[in-house]
């Protein structure tokens, strides 16, 4: 009886240890991916019909060929070398991600993108499409009405207004899974955990925490990315074990702060704790104005010459007033950005200054360009 009480106490203590988080700890499930448990990309080609004159134009030949092939499957024979000119049809590519573990009969969302020169997919219907994996096998069938978030309006004069992207749409639950992708998750004796942010310290902390929770030799850190875990072979026991595994609290260690910016959109994201060493910053604003005009040369009426036009370019470069900003050591980057903004700098200027600070060794952070 006393042995049973001790066993119960052990399970209670283990449960409390798994539930109660430590300082700055995170659940293991948010830090790692399980090797072999991942999504797979699917792709297909088909036609969207029912468009209100916004489909592919005559110069897109493969749309007419696809339409003729489809009609032939339904017993409709077109004359040879006849190009069906239809404005209500668009050739499209279909893409989707098959989540891990999905089986036959389940539905997934799909994205429909125009391949030709269609103006809009709004109001169209996707015809039955086979979605294939990288191995060429068919894993899903797609069909349905396309939902488009963008719109394009065009007047008789040729002027047009476009909001968002009308040539890309989605079909929620538009594909039905017909074949499940096999996984080796239940086959191997070990489960491999891949860290989302590789770090030797984080990998070691994961192994130590799992060994404390489930016993010695349960987990072994293989590298800065991989941690090998011994798991039960029985399917039910393995699922229960993995559910406990995901809730184990891990001290991932301090991650190096990051500065991320997108050069295309001008977006700048600064992580917490980014510091700057002592530096002096000077950034000149350059404005380039280029004006193009054509000069007409009219010859003498009796000279027999021809009237010609010659292009003339007027380029003007204006340099703004430079200001030198002194940055003391230990300054938070947020303060520097506020100072730069007060000088009227654009996001492009901020990105240029951050790159210069990084190259000068004055930025204590990882610089990521996307």
Curated annotation (Swiss-Prot):
One Pfam match: FlgI
GO molecular function annotation: structural molecule activity
First and last residue of the signal peptide: 1-25
Keyword Aminoacyl-tRNA synthetase included in the entry's annotation: no
GO BP annotations, alphabetical order: bacterial-type flagellum-dependent cell motility
Keyword Cytoplasm: no
Keywords annotated in UniProt: Bacterial flagellum, Periplasm, Signal
Cellular compartments per GO CC: bacterial-type flagellum basal body, distal rod, P ring; outer membrane-bounded periplasmic space
Domain of life: Bacteria
Locations listed in the record: Periplasm; Bacterial flagellum basal body
Family: Belongs to the FlgI family.
Function in brief: Assembles around the rod to form the L-ring and probably protects the motor/basal body from shearing forces during rotation.
Complexes and interactors: The basal body constitutes a major portion of the flagellar organelle and consists of four rings (L,P,S, and M) mounted on a central rod.
Full protein name: Flagellar P-ring protein 2
Provenance organism: Yersinia pseudotuberculosis serotype I (strain IP32953)
